[in-house]
Amino acid sequence: LVPCAWAGNVCGEKRAYCCSDPGRYCPWQVVCYESSEICSKKCGK
């Protein structure tokens, strides 16, 4: 598992997705753990 905030940083974004609401963006400080595959998809990779 990789913090989505970290994955977002890789994608050049300083925001992370909410685990409970994948369609919304959460502040950078929100701790949200999902699989790196899911995070990568959300970043359009």
From Swiss-Prot:
The keyword Lipid biosynthesis does not apply. Keywords: Allergen, Disulfide bond. Monomer. It holds the Pfam family Ragweed_pollen. The keyword Disulfide bond applies. Signal peptide: none annotated. It comes from Ambrosia artemisiifolia var. elatior. This is Pollen allergen Amb a 5. It comes from the Eukaryota. SMART domains: Amb_V_allergen (SM00816). Disulfide bonds join C4-C39, C11-C26, C18-C32, C19-C43.
